[in-house]
């Protein structure tokens, strides 16, 4: 064989050292970024398979290349498992990302310049829900809905009133930083009232939906988009679902040839593994634990007057905290916690007054620590460690104590046990 570099450790020491450093970071950091999780070794093995060698433009049994009989099996497995997992009639597992899935949904349902009603970024929406710096805001006329100023929860009556005034061609439901259950049936009612399509982006809550712990949007939305990582605990990638045959043809055409060429069949194989894992009853136990851990952690902040828990609580895998009583902004909080090996992100809060590069809040998610096996006791401990670090951010000796406690926790719950 022409290759003499079968072991990348020996062939590319510089790259190997960087990957080893990242593995060490993941092993010894408490990961609280709500959009991140830890995949199984089986998912990683599938993604590292020989399927990376195969080009397969098109769809199973309708390819533009030969030699696709086995990748057809792989992709068909992923499709059928996704359909079963979410109760959908049609699934497309080819999107490279959630953003690609959202772009395809827009292409399938509306035209450039059409009016779309989506969740405002500061209220908890996503860049692809109409941010002016994103393709969505540049291509379509997005109008943002927000949350109630008092409750910081979605106000469906207000959204209906806004929809009647705006008359959108499409309504987008779903969020990247909203800690409450979303009523997709209500959103479909609103869409029907104004003759609009409904698209649901369930990227953050897909694992909870799969486990039956959040209302399933598939019966209500014309198209559902998702990522396959986050709470679903699969590889980084996207997913499209629908119950409408005509729309399924449009969304498939939007992905290929509209947005993408050859699908990443090695990633699709990893998606198939993740879907099988999510169909296992043990995954429901995992999702329940995620919700319990998040609630336990949020409760600690709710009881501390120095912090403000956005919307007063959480129903899912994440929550937001206003930290400005103890530290200047979310950016500084994120950087400080990085120093003690707790990883999370700064985040705008509803009706934000600071720059999006600074923010008043932080976003905390518990999917990854739950994958490590941590429970409600550890979740409360982590919350207290975060508070201890933020309140004492100018006291190096206390920060060192926090760093030590973080290491004790991560050592007790290893990420990938060494063989």
Swiss-Prot record:
GO terms for molecular function: glycine hydroxymethyltransferase activity; pyridoxal phosphate binding. The record marks 229 as: Plays an important role in substrate specificity. It comes from the Bacteria. The modification N6-(pyridoxal phosphate)lysine is found at residue 230. It is found in: Cytoplasm. (6S)-5,6,7,8-tetrahydrofolate binds at residues 121, 125-127, 355-357. Its cofactor is pyridoxal 5'-phosphate. It catalyses: (6R)-5,10-methylene-5,6,7,8-tetrahydrofolate + glycine + H2O = (6S)-5,6,7,8-tetrahydrofolate + L-serine. Its main location: cytoplasm. InterPro entries: PyrdxlP-dep_Trfase, PyrdxlP-dep_Trfase_major, PyrdxlP-dep_Trfase_small, Ser_HO-MeTrfase, Ser_HO-MeTrfase-like, Ser_HO-MeTrfase_PLP_BS, SHMT-like_dom. Pathway: One-carbon metabolism; tetrahydrofolate interconversion; Amino-acid biosynthesis; glycine biosynthesis; glycine from L-serine: step 1/1. Its EC number is 2.1.2.1. Homodimer. This is Serine hydroxymethyltransferase. It comes from Streptococcus equi subsp. equi (strain 4047).
